[in-house]
Amino acid sequence: MTMPATSKPTLIVEGLKTEFTTRGGVARAVDDVSFTVGRGEIMGLVGESGSGKSMTGYSIMGLIDPPGRVVGGRIELTGRDGVTHDLRTLSAGQMRDMRGNRIAMIFQDPMMTLNPVLRVDTQMTEAVLAHQRVSRQQAREMAREALAKVGIPSPEARLQAYPHQFSGGMRQRVAIAIALLNKPDLIIADEPTTALDVTIQGQILAEVQTLCRESGTALIWITHDLSVVAGLADRVCVMYAGRIVEQGSVQQVLETPRHPYTFGLIASAPSRNPRGVPLRQIPGMTPSLLALPSGCAFRERCAFATEVCKQTPLLESLDDGRALRCFHPVTQRPEEATA
């Protein structure tokens, strides 16, 4: 714990590195990742499977199990009270106290949060009592209010239910309510709406956005879906092979992407292609973390790659406020691309 600071971002991640030791070698799942998230800000962390986005979230939460380990970097959390915690220096017990209290996580599968043999009221009141000095009756009232906030009808009656008595969308709402219970400074959401239909997904996204704005809770939303980020987030970081390759405001990154990988993702979206025109695609496959090419990890799939791309590009700030890891920034817009 360090001195109080009132103007700092809620979260500062700097030079984060997470490795997994395997029989085939060492895979760096998170490689020199840096970003900040302000109070009440929603940041999208985007990338395809294996990009390192979920591992970044688990690293912040202190949930990396062997053979994985965080080997470098700084993770600082500054609460509403202005006190800064260096999460990497905390003991296992101290991190346990932080989770569910100052930081919370919403998982893709709500049953990773919910115990199938306990009623919802039992699980929610225990989550409050573990971190706050209140009576059981007060904790239960807080649970009821949290269910109401996430749009669950008849919250008093639903407290009496078991998880299997809820639909998938309602279970995810309960998981979100549990994450919000203790008014955390930071929530990390790992693709929590992926398995839900579009209508339910839209409702939950709107509710989460409103709740974060009202409470001042910072949110990292991990997803592979650019359309979700477009409607939810303020800023976005795009990850590829364990590294952030581009970050900036949602409008900047989605409308005028500068990294060839971001450009390829957006240009290949069906909504940008007229009917009857073949979809664009990014050639090749995502490289194995055990056999990354030298220099830029994207260079073997990139149409703009030259000899200089065999060197490792740094994540550098641009004049427009975004950051980019590329020697050859794209200048055209995605809608100008041809198949």
Q: Where in this protein do the model-derived segments appear?
A:
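ABC ATPase NBD coupling module
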Residues: 69, 81-104, 122, 130, ...
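Conserved ABC ATPase signature
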Residues: 161-166, 170
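Short catalytic/signature loops enriched in Gly
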Residues: 7-9, 84, 153-157, 247-339
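Conserved ABC ATPase "signature" region
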Residues: 76, 138-157, 266-267
